[in-house]
């Protein structure tokens, strides 16, 4: 049995080890401590300092490490364990790409458009929080005897967030309460009880002018305006540019999200403002928008992010260079080859390898999918 390759996963604490051997029993096992009844190679891996558990299914292992353990120390020990036991090859093939490093997916559970629970999901963790009791009470008021609650409730995608999951939850809760103020709940209940309310796609979309937005003193109202904003056009850029200077992070982040919907090179200077924002969440969101748009003209700005203090931002920069970069970015990549975050270092190495091997820059996964439909 040999190691064919080692691949990063969306979780920074998990690596996928692909083997040359496929289990014939089609079963799966999770191992957390050394036991005599277990395969010898599993016990060897569990004996490595820093490894906390191993999941074995089909032809791969999912190896989990302690949060403070270092993959750069652990991976050579994993290879050595297989080499000692099976005399396998020392080399490991090029890792595959993790397109979602550091992301926390935020969702809002609603019933007939009335929100009552938040769910956050990262690669290795899920966190839920119920909204204040008044939201649950109004959701209950919206129910009728004929409603199928399980069928009619919906998870609304609130987009991705970045950072500590509990801090993200606190921020998302603040955003949701601003977007759906208690004063609006009776209106939502009234709408929910209307006879023709057969679908559960209720959402307010309302365009606001620059003057109306500028005249609003309450940041929660400004955020609500942006959250209920229809797909923006070029005429909305002055309003969104103003929102980029807002004192509140959720407002600036939502402005970036809306700017990213204007699929044109003309919005790049505004996204660059997001790259320089003091909040790493806004910087990463701006980087994600630029990556989705896939304009190589953004490469000089993204190269600068290789020096960002936050690894989730540096990783996005390295990923964009992998997707869109060329030989011009090699000096910058090599200057950052020893990044102290393993995930970033790995992505930089992959970008260098692709460029030096002369492989074509295919763009982001989103861009590749879009190109296939043309």
Swiss-Prot record:
Cleaved signal peptide residues: none
Coiled-coil segments: none
InterPro entries: ARM-like, ARM-type_fold, Nfu/NifU_N, Nfu/NifU_N_sf, PBS_lyase_HEAT, Virulence_F_dom
Gene Ontology molecular function terms on file: oxidoreductase activity
Keywords of this entry: Virulence
Pfam families attached to this UniProt entry: HEAT_2, Nfu_N, Virulence_fact
Domain of life the protein comes from: Bacteria
Function according to Swiss-Prot or TrEMBL: Required for hemolysin production. Contributes to virulence in both silkworm-infection model and mice.
Family to which the UniProt record says this protein belongs: Belongs to the CvfC family.
PANTHER family (UniProt xref): CONSERVED VIRULENCE FACTOR C, PBS LYASE HEAT-LIKE PROTEIN
Protein name from the UniProt record: Conserved virulence factor C
Source species: Staphylococcus aureus (strain NCTC 8325 / PS 47)
Lineage: Bacteria, Bacillati, Bacillota, Bacilli, Bacillales
């Amino acid at each position: 049995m040999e190691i064919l390759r080692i691949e990063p996963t969306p979780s920074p604490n998990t690596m996928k080890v692909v083997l040359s051997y496929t289990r014939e029993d089609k079963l799966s096992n999770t191992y957390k401590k050394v036991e005599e009844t277990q395969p010898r190679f599993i016990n060897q891996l569990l004996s490595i300092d820093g490894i906390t558990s191993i999941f074995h299914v089909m032809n791969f292992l999912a190896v989990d490490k302690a949060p403070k353990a270092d993959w750069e120390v652990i991976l050579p020990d994993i290879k050595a364990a297989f080499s000692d036991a099976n005399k396998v090859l020392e080399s490991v093939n090029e890792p595959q790409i993790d397109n979602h490093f550091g992301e926390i997916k935020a969702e809002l559970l609603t019933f007939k458009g009335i929100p009552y629970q938040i769910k956050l999901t990262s690669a290795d963790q899920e966190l839920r929080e119920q909204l204040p009791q008044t939201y649950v009470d109004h959701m209950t008021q919206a129910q009728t005897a004929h409603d199928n609650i399980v069928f009619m409730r919906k998870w609304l995608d609130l987009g991705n967030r970045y950072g500590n999951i509990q801090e993200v939850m606190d921020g998302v809760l603040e955003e949701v309460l601003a977007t759906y103020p208690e004063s609006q709940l009776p209106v939502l209940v009234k709408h929910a009880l209307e006879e023709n309310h057969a679908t559960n796609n209720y959402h307010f979309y309302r365009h606001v002018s620059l003057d109306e937005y500028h005249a609003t003193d309450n940041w929660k109202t400004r955020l609500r305006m942006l959250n209920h904003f229809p797909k923006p056009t070029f005429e909305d850029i002055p309003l969104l540019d103003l929102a980029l200077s807002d004192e509140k992070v959720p407002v600036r982040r939502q402005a970036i999200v809306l700017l990213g919907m204007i699929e044109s090179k003309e919005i790049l200077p505004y996204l660059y403002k997001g790259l320089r924002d003091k909040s790493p969440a806004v910087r990463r969101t701006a980087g994600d928008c630029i990556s989705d748009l896939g304009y190589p003209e953004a490469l000089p700005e993204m190269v600068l992010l290789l020096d960002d203090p936050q690894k989730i931002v540096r990783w996005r920069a390295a990923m964009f260079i992998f997707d869109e970069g060329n030989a011009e970015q090699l000096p910058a990549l090599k200057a950052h080859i020893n990044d102290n975050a393993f995930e970033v270092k790995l992505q930089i190495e992959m970008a260098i390898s692709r460029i030096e091997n002369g492989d074509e820059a295919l763009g982001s996964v989103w861009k590749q999918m879009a190109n296939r439909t043309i």
